[in-house]
Swiss-Prot record:
One of its GO terms (biological process) is cytochrome complex assembly. PANTHER family: INNER MEMBRANE PROTEIN YPJD. This is Uncharacterized 28.8 kDa protein in nifR3-like 5'region. GO terms for molecular function: heme binding. Disulfide bonds: none annotated. Pfam families: Cytochrom_C_asm. GO terms for cellular component: plasma membrane. InterPro entries: Cyt_c_assembly, YpjD/HemX.
Length: 271
């Protein structure tokens, strides 16, 4: 077993306590369930992936699928910790978010042996670093928006069927989920717009062109349009519920195909 696999498995195990926390009987203890165990599990779940991701990119950026996924997991954990500290209901998204991140971590571990090319290009390093940082933040924000949207969908369905489950009793109320979804989508749209702008700047430095009609660009623009359309529709007609959830998940799927999806094809299938 290679050293990298061992490190990746260690980062994966660091996510396990946080992933099982919502399903453990102690989840109802402490301040609204946010006990010392909860915060300790979140810190561990952030520290493991973050340390491993920083080790892989130390000195220079690698564009491999596994590295990108670990960076994304660390960013999502950090954002979730901040939201849990600043709001009353965000921590209740943990039954949906944390097992999902554990699954992504398992996939990152399986992809550890895939090629991890180093970023090269003619653009100044600051522009490349800025573009990568903005892309990671965008994906983390939209991940949280998709989770909040899924929570609202599950709650709405349980209310209509009058059959709540232990999961829906744990999740935030519909209004809280939709409020978080809207705020996260607004932030995602702003940061994604900045990401498209920095991407154009990097491409201009490298090729002299502002746009390139590749899969990543087209899917990113499509995500920007879908999110913008949803925000506009919400402002004008108050669209919400299942329709809003579907549009958010479509935007998340498009952005997933644009970032991890393209890396999966180039690094794993074609690598």
């Amino acid at each position: 077993m290679s050293q990298n696999i061992v490190y990746s498995l260690t980062a994966l195990m660091a996510l396990l306590p946080a992933s099982i926390y919502p399903y453990h009987r102690i989840a109802g203890q402490g301040a609204d369930g946010r006990s010392a165990y909860f915060w300790g599990a979140l810190v561990l779940g952030f520290a493991g992936p973050a340390a491993w991701a920083l080790t892989q990119v130390a000195g220079r950026w690698h564009t491999g699928l596994s590295t990108a996924l670990w960076i994304t997991i660390a960013a999502c954990m950090l954002l979730f910790m901040a939201m849990s500290a600043l709001t009353r209901s965000a921590w209740r998204l943990s039954p949906l978010l944390l097992p999902y991140l554990l699954t992504v971590g398992a996939f990152a571990t399986l992809a550890q042996q895939a090629p991890a090319p180093v970023v090269r290009g003619g653009a100044p390093g600051i522009w490349i670093d800025l573009h990568i940082a903005v892309s990671v933040i965008t994906y983390a924000l939209l991940t949280m928006a998709a989770v909040a949207s899924l929570a609202a969908f599950l709650q709405e369905r349980a209310l209509k069927s009058k059959r709540p489950t232990p999961l829906t009793r744990f999740l935030p109320p519909v209004t809280e989920s939709e409020r978080m979804q809207l705020h996260l989508l607004g932030a995602s749209e702003a940061v994604l717009g900045a990401g498209l702008a920095t991407g154009m700047a990097v491409l201009y430095y490298e090729t002299g062109a502002l746009l390139r009609a590749d899969h990543k660009t087209l899917l990113s623009v499509a995500s920007f349009v879908v999110i913008g359309g949803l925000l506009l529709a919400h402002a004008r007609t108050g669209v919400r519920g299942r329709m809003a959830a579907r549009l958010v998940l479509i935007a998340y799927l498009l952005l997933t195909l644009a970032y991890p999806g393209v890396k999966f094809v180039t690094d794993v299938l074609l690598g």
